[in-house]
Structure formats: structure tokens, C-alpha cells
């Protein structure tokens, strides 16, 4: 059986985490060109620290990442670095965002983190399906203008 570990000089390690973080005020800003740029920035910053991105998905108002962080970094140390440096890079490229966010803080203060063990495949699948789940949730919030039982158009106010 092949072990799924990485190694340093005298250390074998497997430190995988599911991390979720969001823009300040949970604004739906991560789409289009800015989504591509944020993805490139995060990949570059992870590469600098030797952090492997196993799976990632950027939704409009949050980012999911499954990462392997070397044991020489704590999760909080890495997240402080990632969110701090990426904020500076985002505001450097999109200076107009300073007025929306103020104080050069693009991300919310906190984040969600969970360790990953035997459930790695399930978490990868969950992250891959995040965009579809967000889209489905958005569709459910749209008003129905067709009666689901008869298929006939519905006058406004009938369902309210």
C-alpha cells in the first residue's frame, strides 16, 4: 500500500485541510476577471510556501480549498499570510475596491478549517459541486411564474 505522505529531511507528513473563507461583508464579488486573478494570486502564494492545492473552487461569495500544508506552518499562520498578501495584491490590481472595503481588508476576519483524513475523496467531490449547489440555490429563490402542477402561467400574487 502506497502511503499518501510528503517528506522533509527527517519527517514524513500528511497534513490536509479543508478551508473556506469569504470576502468582507460576504459580498458576491468573485466572478469573471477578478475570479481568474484571485485564483492566480492564491496559486502563486501557495506555491511560494510549498502548499499543495489538491482541489479548489471559487464561488461568488466564498472560496473552498483542499490543501496540504507543510507541518512547519500552522494553519492560522498560513491563512494570515494567504489572506493578507492576497488582499494587498487584489487592492494593487483593483484599486477601486479600496472604497468598498476600506482599510485594505478584502477578506472576512475568520475562516473555516477542518482536518481531512479518510474522507478526502468525499471532500474533493463536495468542493467540485459547490458552484452547482450555489446555482441551484439561486434558482430556488427565483419566483415561480409557472404553476408546477398544471404548467400554466401564474398571475403575480397567486402564490403570495
Q: At which residue positions do the language-model features occur?
A:
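Basic nucleic-acid-binding interfaces
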Residues: 1-160
Amino acid at each position: 500500500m502506497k502511503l499518501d505522505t510528503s517528506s522533509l529531511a527527517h519527517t514524513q507528513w500528511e497534513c490536509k485541510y479543508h478551508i473556506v473563507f469569504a470576502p468582507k461583508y460576504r459580498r458576491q464579488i468573485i466572478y469573471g476577471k477578478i475570479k481568474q486573478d484571485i485564483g492566480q494570486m492564491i496559486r502563486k502564494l501557495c506555491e511560494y510556501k510549498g502548499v499543495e492545492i489538491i482541489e479548489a473552487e471559487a464561488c461568488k461569495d466564498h472560496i473552498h480549498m483542499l490543501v496540504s500544508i507543510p507541518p512547519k506552518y500552522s494553519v492560522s499562520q498560513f491563512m494570515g499570510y494567504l489572506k493578507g498578501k492576497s488582499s494587498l495584491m487584489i487592492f494593487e490590481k483593483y484599486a477601486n475596491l479600496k472604497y468598498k472595503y476600506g482599510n485594505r481588508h478584502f477578506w472576512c476576519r475568520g475562516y473555516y478549517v477542518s482536518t481531512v483524513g479518510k474522507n478526502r475523496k468525499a471532500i474533493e467531490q463536495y468542493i467540485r459541486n459547490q458552484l452547482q449547489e450555489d446555482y441551484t440555490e439561486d434558482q430556488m429563490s427565483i419566483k415561480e411564474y409557472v404553476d408546477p402542477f398544471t404548467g400554466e402561467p401564474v398571475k403575480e400574487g397567486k402564490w403570495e
